[in-house]
Amino acid sequence: GARIVWHRDRFIASEFDGKIWTSPTGETGTWTLRYDDAASGEFRLATNGEICVLTRFASPYVLTSYDGVTWVPRVVPDGFGVSQLVDVVAGGRGFLASADCTANVQWFALSPDGIVWYPQAVPASGYWFTPLWNGSVYVVLNGGGASGIWTSPTGLEGTWTLAYTSATQYYRATVLNGRFILGGNDSSTLTSDDGYTWTLHSAALPGSAEAMDALGEVAICLHYGTFSVSSDGVTWVEYPMG
């Protein structure tokens, strides 16, 4: 999930303090505050082009909007036990929201339309974040002392495969032309075209990955004071900020 998405005819952006803004162009002075709830914590956004879904750290855990202006809370089923819906992605069966499963919570949330949500048992405990979809499979990262990369064609319980484990933490990730690209805290990257077979590229980045996204035909990775650009997730070119 992102903190800024292009939805229909406008940008929608979220903040750590529970605010949601929209803008037709993204330029300074064009942003309008649409929602403000400081108690909700961090927001993450995903859109399928029809409806925008927002997940958050407090109840109600899911909000939806067709236009970015009016936001409607959606019910997470009783017994879900969700303490935090950490992130969300739009993909094959609809929307997949990952959760903080470090304690009693042992569910993902899956929805075909963003409105009705169904619990799906996770394959392991842990902090599940950065769900991704490449057009064929979901990939979700399980963080902690090590990174576990789990893959599923549907997001349904019982369909997840542990595809890769590493002592390196891979918190930043994106999808570029169907390829999964993960950035590590040690300047390495991981790439995969199918979500199951992963290739390690040691020292591919000029520093640790602080943020990563895809824009057009390139992936962009932010570092402290610089950023780097790649067309394949393997070879990166560093540039100064500003």
Mark where each language-model region is.
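Repeated scaffold domains used in trafficking and secretory/extracellular systems
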Residues: 1-7, 39-48, 81-91, 125-134, ...
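Entry beta-strands of beta-propeller and related beta-repeat scaffolds
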Residues: 9-13, 50-54, 92-97, 136-140, ...
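Structural signal for beta-propeller blades
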Residues: 20, 60-62, 105-108, 147-149, ...
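Conserved Ser/Thr-centered positions that define the repeating blades of beta-propeller domains
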Residues: 23-24, 65, 111, 152-153, ...
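Beta-strand initiation motifs
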Residues: 27-32, 69-72, 115-118, 156-161, ...
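Short loop/turn motifs that cap or connect beta-strands within the blades
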Residues: 33-39, 74-79, 120-124, 162-167, ...
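Blade-level signature of beta-propeller repeat domains, shared across WD40, Kelch, NHL, RCC1
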Residues: 225-242
